[in-house]
């Protein structure tokens, strides 16, 4: 589902990284991949190409709980997530265990300043967060926003600067 939006969302993250030096970027499919270095290229096409080459599980489905656990264990809890605004760009579809998603989102939420989740599907008329990963994550999210258009990304940019 997110495939349609993935390139635009990664370009958005690249643009944010070009404006701020304290941004880290990861992709989460069936595994967690840090792409901060790849997205540091000034040229957006080069950055996107480098990121795509670094991600082995592009379009391979999503295991949100396991990936968020890996982030928490390796990067987040004792490091970069502490006191940070964490932005998750996802449709919430998950191939893993929803209980793990809930547990790991709760764990992440305890150490962050806030969690912002941008879901491209949220703009769909009559959308309800019924995907099991999205439903499990929702109680631990501070801002649940759309992520499907230029205007929604502009609004997201404003939200991130608050």
What positions do the PLM features span?
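Extended hydrophobic-aromatic, low-complexity segments
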Residues: 5, 18, 25, 36-37, ...
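Exposed acidic/Ser/Thr-rich ligand/metal-binding surfaces
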Residues: 65-111, 145, 155, 159-162
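Short glycine-/polar-rich loops that comprise or flank the Walker A/P-loop
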Residues: 19-23, 83-84, 111-114, 140-141
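A short acidic, amphipathic alpha-helical/loop segment
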Residues: 8, 12, 100-107, 133
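Von Willebrand factor
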Residues: 1-84, 86-87, 126-129
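Active-site proximal loops enriched in glycine and acidic residues that flank catalytic Cys/His/Asp
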Residues: 6, 27-30, 88-92, 97, ...
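Von Willebrand factor type A / integrin I
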Residues: 105-162
């Amino acid at each position: 589902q997110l495939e349609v939006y993935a390139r635009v969302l990664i370009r958005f993250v690249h643009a944010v990284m070009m404006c701020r030096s304290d941004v880290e970027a990861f992709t989460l499919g069936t595994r967690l991949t840090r792409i901060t270095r790849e997205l540091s290229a000034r040229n957006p096409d080069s950055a996107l190409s480098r990121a795509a080459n670094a991600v082995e599980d592009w379009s391979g489905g999503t295991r949100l709980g396991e990936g968020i656990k890996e982030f928490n264990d390796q990067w987040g809890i004792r490091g970069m997530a502490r006191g940070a605004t964490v932005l998750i760009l996802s449709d919430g579809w998950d191939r893993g265990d929803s209980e793990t998603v809930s547990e790991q989102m709760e764990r992440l939420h305890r150490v962050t300043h806030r969690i912002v989740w941008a879901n491209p599907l949220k703009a769909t008329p009559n959308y309800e967060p019924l995907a099991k990963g999205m439903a499990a994550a929702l109680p631990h999210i501070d801002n649940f926003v759309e992520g499907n258009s230029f205007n929604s990304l502009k609004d997201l940019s404003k939200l991130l600067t608050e």
